Amino acid sequence: MVALESAHLVGAGGALGALCRHYLAGAIQRETFPLGTLTVNAFGSFALGLLTFAGVTGDAALLVGVGACGSFTTFSSFSVETVRLWENGYVALAALNAVGNLACALVGIGLAWGIVRIV
């Protein structure tokens, strides 16, 4: 029964995170550069960092961390968008997207870590 309850929490959080990603990324996505994906990955990393470094565990970690943050961020879309940029001859933008996603995610995690340490 515990596994089923955990699955429900992850699923509910996942539905919420996916919907938020869809609308937020869609609202700020650009034709020439996948700004929407970069933004959700950075923000999602920050949010997951806050949860993790604040010591959130149990049901809240399943709902928000695994479910919502896990589905809000998207490594697969980032990867496909990077390859598409490369395929279309935008090699510099592909490199910028690859480096930018990693850098922004790490900055988000770092900011979260710093905030939790201060508070």
UniProtKB/Swiss-Prot annotation:
Keyword Metal-binding: yes
Membrane topology of the entry: Multi-pass membrane protein
Location(s), subcellular: Cell membrane
One GO process term, biological-process aspect: cellular detoxification of fluoride
GO molecular function, one term: fluoride channel activity
InterPro entries: FluC
Any one of the GO CC terms: plasma membrane
Record key words, sorted: Cell membrane, Ion channel, Ion transport, Membrane, Metal-binding, Sodium, Transmembrane, Transmembrane helix, Transport
Residues reported in the UniProt entry to bind Na(+): 70, 73
Activity regulation (record text): Na(+) is not transported, but it plays an essential structural role and its presence is essential for fluoride channel function.
Transmembrane residue ranges: 46-66, 96-116
UniProt-listed NCBIfam families: crcB
Similarity comment text for this entry: Belongs to the fluoride channel Fluc/FEX (TC 1.A.43) family.
PANTHER family: FLUORIDE EXPORT PROTEIN 1-RELATED
Xref: HAMAP family: FluC
Protein purpose: Fluoride-specific ion channel. Important for reducing fluoride concentration in the cell, thus reducing its toxicity.
The protein's name: Fluoride-specific ion channel FluC 2
Lineage, opening ranks: Archaea, Methanobacteriati, Methanobacteriota, Stenosarchaea group, Halobacteria
Encoding gene (name): fluC2
